[in-house]
Amino acid sequence: MSDNTVDYKATLNLPKTDFPMRAGLPKREPEWLERWAEIGIYDRLRNKTERESFTLHDGPPYANGSLHIGHALNKILKDMVVRSQQMMGKDARYIPGWDCHGLPIEWKIEEKYRKKGRDKDEVPVLEFRKECREFAEGWVDIQREEFKRLGITGKWENPYLTMDFHSERVIAAEFQKFLMNGTLYQGSKPVMWSPIEKTALAEAEVEYHDKESFTVWVKFKVVGTGDATLDSAKVVIWTTTPWTMPSNKAVVYGAGISYGLYEVIGRPEECWARIGERFILADRLAEDVLGRARLDTTMFRRLCSVTQDDLAKIQLLHPLHGVKDGEGEWDDIRDFRAADFVTDTEGTGFVHCAPSHGLEEFELYRDLGMLEQVITYNVMEDGRFRADLPFFGGKAILKPNGKEGNANGAIIEKLTEVGGLLARGKIKHSYPHSWRSKAPVIYRNTPQWFAAVDKPVNDGLDTYGKSIRDRALTSIDELVTWTPPTGRNRLYSMIEARPDWVLSRQRAWGVPLTCFTKNGSLPTDDDYLLRNEAVNARVLEAFEVEGADAWYKDGAKERFLGGIVTPEDYTQVFDILDVWFDSGSTHAFVLRDREDGSEDGLADLYLEGTDQHRGWFHSSMLQSCG
């Protein structure tokens, strides 16, 4: 190589600067964040007076676990909005908050107990609540530092927490509005129930996953028609929940469906249908149903049509009718009637009804005034059959780990033994699961506390409607601006079709339903619920100082009722509120009550993902309209 190599760098007129070649962000970013904290950047931005305010109300994340990418996206989007409004000259307020009560935290504490061989039900409730509070406090601190590391500007030294004493007081006060305005009631209806967590769940606490389920085609014997052609024929139902068969009380058919009577004239081996057996089926589904029983089209024939008049004469026997050692559990005649929810798109054209485990069936017999005849209480809170149920007592629908229990197998085996099955199989379908335990849920009839969404609200505030539903729908159209506009349609359709709000949960970590019921009265009696402003005021005063723990302390009932009514005449309710009621009440204890909330108690913006149309948007709308 020649010694005369040209140094081209020396021939260039390069600018010189004191700026470092690399930004050094890993080192510099923490320094900037520390500087912002030292000077109190959020409060300094508030110092300028007489500016138009802008309030973004933060939907609270759950105080459980470290941040994930969804948290980051959510908070960064909010930070962009707040900073933009600030740079446009507004007083842009952002108070971060956390959802601190509820099942996910209880579940973590119970996991700790299980590892130690400790039974949660044997732990004093105040001790359990203390552990839940400490767990939530720990995760609030961790998540706060993680959010600050993302550079999010907000009131981090004084966020809102749903477990703060003042927050719990306000949540109780908001609940008392429902108590006093007549929309709160105790009812018994099928709700989504988690046997693993032993509590009712809201729709927003459920997620859908594929699940493989047992599926059975079951025969009900026809009696009482006086028609030799129909008597002793079998009506066939199809279900993916064999565990509901012991609770069957009826079968329903469709008023507009064409039905026929089909006779078996041949059969293969290992077939549960017998030659000469006759089945009533929807014509559109008959070939498929009989095919499930391994009968090809040469092995059965259609004898005749079965008219609506014919169906109206039919009575049915449960497949376990008269079974030995059944103790008469299934020996009464099963109701048989038309229902508008029956179709012939799948199944058999008939639907088996266990009104304790299906909302449509429950509503059908409620409207008929026949609930007392059809409601059963066969399934306990842990998903096991009551101990004295013949054949199936103590059998579990689900194991404690959420896997398939032994109930379905035992029922299928018994139905096979008595000749009650036409066919069986398995099906993979979308099925509701608890979002926390990931275990399947069931529908179970239990006494719960509800907010009636269609009952007139007795508060004299009818500008936007008389009922919670009417007010919510009017507010969606007249008081809220939607971006994108499709968000309006999503929430409107959900609220338009939703049932009454299940407020109660059978858990311990949350704000209790601060109410009392009168001994000897029925839920339908006017005096069943104690509605007393002086009692309510005592409760709220205690919650402000001691938090919701005051409800669980010894002598609480006498403390709140003594000198006003006779404590011995009332029972204290210990269910806790749905955590969505907690977060739905944040407008009251953040926007309304805090000096740095908003002047009019309203937010300029709620910014969340579309999942909150059935979550926080939904509960905030319902709660504020009650």
Task: Please describe what each predicted stretch is.
Residues 2-18, 22-25, 31, 35-39, ...:
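Residue patterns forming the tRNA-binding/recognition surfaces of aminoacyl-tRNA synthetases
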Residues 22-52, 290-296, 305-306:
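Histidine-rich, glycine-flanked metal-binding segment
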Residues 42-44, 297-305, 315-318, 420-426, ...:
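Short secondary-structure junctions
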Residues 60, 98-102, 383:
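Acidic, glycine-rich active-site loops and adjacent beta-strand->loop/helix elements
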Residues 62-96, 107, 111-114, 192-197, ...:
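Conserved active-site neighborhood of enzyme catalytic/cofactor-binding cores
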Residues 93-95, 100-103, 174-180:
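Hydrophobic or amphipathic alpha-helical targeting/insertion segments
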